[in-house]
């Protein structure tokens, strides 16, 4: 069990890695690249659909240039045009033959992008596709001192593999035509709606389980307290609840350790390191899934859940746990082996949700002070590693790690994700574990307080904290779409909503001190009530 708990905390440290993000930006507003007359386009991704000998073939993705006309966004407005190899192949000098409205396929060469485009346009080409010399895509920019940039044909850069695939087809004597367009993303994709429901539902389930466990522990404690002083001492000195309360120091240390962990991921990000993260995620996912299933099934198989068997290194384990564990292990292993398959995201989300629910049930925020410190630190952590880190690393560290840009993976596994079903660019909508888990700890605290104070849904704090969390996450997705899909730190919006709701409500109701310092309502201990001397009956007067 100690190993499982360690795995859970390892995942907890990794959970604050990524904010909500879309499947990839298609529009890049670059303020660093020079903007001069005739060279001021935004950098956009471009679909290049090919036909070989009249039959539809592969589709490639490139990036549009800073100069020239913008690529059309509608497929129906994009012309299907013949593709030809340039001669010379780099188009750094004027082509030997005139072309009549065709698109030229050229190699990167050593001359400027604008020079290639000018020679291609002068030869009568209607466009130019440049093959990059590396796998990545570069931004085709202009130099500050360039003039006479009246270029009227579009230019697109393809990565090396895609460009040479077209080059091979052309050199084999085939007839190739292409269609170039850059479709817009939908304003709202159903993936974002389902991801919002998934995140809110996870916090809801985890909060009720945490509050239910706390209520059962409290009822058991009050029952034992009534049995006498000796039992009271045993209860006070024992720690059989299995819950872990966070304090202020551990809340601060969590963010420090998470920052170190994030830097390590950024610096060491590679295929083998992602494999290690997958193993850690599977260990935590197995523990989470097993805990959730045992808790759910124990209501129907009570005898199996209350009968225990000694297992080496693990101690006493219930028969129900032994029965469920193989299924959980097989499920996690199958996901790890087949995680690149189209529907593997379902397995990842199931393991992730189970892990988050388990952590919220085990780890508790004891009062509003600790919750405020934890979420405030996470708030600045998110902002720093999404926005401020660009100044030192020239890229957003958190987004690079979350997307797995330096690996062949789709990103680190510590994410919930859903494919963007109606997005022509595909990709995933994602949310980091920390954006669910950390606010979820505060929401669970609110429900535990409500139940301990015997508050109704309307007069308590849980309903409003859930509304605040859902609203903050909703605003995150609004900001995400307004920023053209650029990754957003979700805690930037969620923390002010959730903390603000609890603090303002507590202050208005005059309960802020109890929430802040004690974390529980005033109540009289039943044992002390039992031990208080009873008032004497006055003697009867004759």
UniProtKB/Swiss-Prot annotation:
Modifications the protein undergoes after translation, according to the UniProt entry: Glycosylated.
Family annotation (CDD domains): PA_GO-like
InterPro entries per record: PA_dom_sf, PA_domain, Peptidase_A22B_SPP, Preselin/SPP
Domain PA positions: 92-167
Membrane-spanning intervals of the chain: 193-213, 246-266, 276-296, 317-337, 343-363, 368-388, 427-447, 460-480, 487-507
SMART domains on file: PSN
Gene Ontology CC, one term: Golgi-associated vesicle membrane
Segments in the Cytoplasmic topological domain: 214-245, 297-316, 364-367, 448-459, 508-542
Sites where a glycan is attached: 79, 145
Ranges per topology, Lumenal: 24-192, 267-275, 338-342, 389-426, 481-486
Listed name of the protein: Signal peptide peptidase-like 5
Name of the gene encoding the protein in the UniProt record: SPPL5
